[in-house]
Design a protein with these regions (language model features):
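Aromatic-lined substrate-binding rim segments of carbohydrate-active enzymes
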Residues: 4, 31-109, 139
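Boundary/entry segment of secreted carbohydrate-active catalytic domains
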Residues: 5-27
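Short, well-ordered coil/turn segments that N-cap beta-strands
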Residues: 10-15, 42-44, 76-82, 144-150
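Active-site-proximal loop/turn and secondary-structure-junction residues that shape catalytic pockets
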Residues: 21-23, 52, 88-90, 155-159
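Glycine-rich anion/phosphate-binding loops
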Residues: 25-31, 61-67, 125-133
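Polysaccharide-binding and catalytic clefts of secreted carbohydrate-active enzymes
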Residues: 98-100, 104-166
Length: 166
């Protein structure tokens, strides 16, 4: 049987981790230095978007994805591919303020406060609607993007291969 390598440009081995450059959008020098250090460490793939919801959608219905494309382009130009994650585990403050039912209720019957990771109430219709919309928009914008090869949805614990990297 012939051995097949799924990610041939990555030598069959994905090496990297989560990367959160959205905190440095006003500092392109930091992105450049991060990429230099990633290349030095042999990183060939990073996960983007895990905590980006408040940057993607700073106000309800106002979406900004252009910064993500620029970062994906810079990474790709340096031999680093993207696993694109949905940001469902870190909701923006506006969502919790407007839809407090999106926050989990603890065993004590008290609703958790904003700012806790993965503090979502899975049965909240508004939370489910908002995460479905975000997933849909990311898939439409980046599903066929040559820089991304996996789509990660931590809320639903799966990875979806977009395409083989060759």
């Amino acid at each position: 049987m012939e051995k097949q390598i799924l990610f041939s440009k990555l030598n069959g081995f994905v090496h990297g981790g989560d990367y959160n450059p959205e905190q440095w959008l006003d500092r392109p020098d930091i992105l450049e230095e991060d990429i230099r250090m990633m290349k030095k460490a042999g990183v060939n793939c990073v996960t983007l978007g895990v905590f980006s919801w408040s940057v993607y959608e700073p106000r309800e219905g106002e979406f900004h994805f252009e910064w993500l494309k620029k970062i994906m382009d810079s990474l790709y130009e340096n031999g680093i591919y993207t696993i694109l994650a949905t940001p469902s585990g870190a909701r923006p403050a506006w969502l919790d303020k407007k839809y407090p039912e999106a926050m989990r209720v603890g065993k004590n019957g008290q609703r958790n406060h904003h700012g806790v990771r993965h503090n979502h109430c899975m049965s909240s219709p508004e939370y489910r609607k908002k995460t479905a919309l975000m997933d849909k928009l990311l898939a439409e914008k980046f599903g066929q993007h040559h820089r991304a090869f996996l789509f990660q949805n931590p809320l639903r614990d799966f990875y979806l291969m977009i395409k083989s990297v060759h």
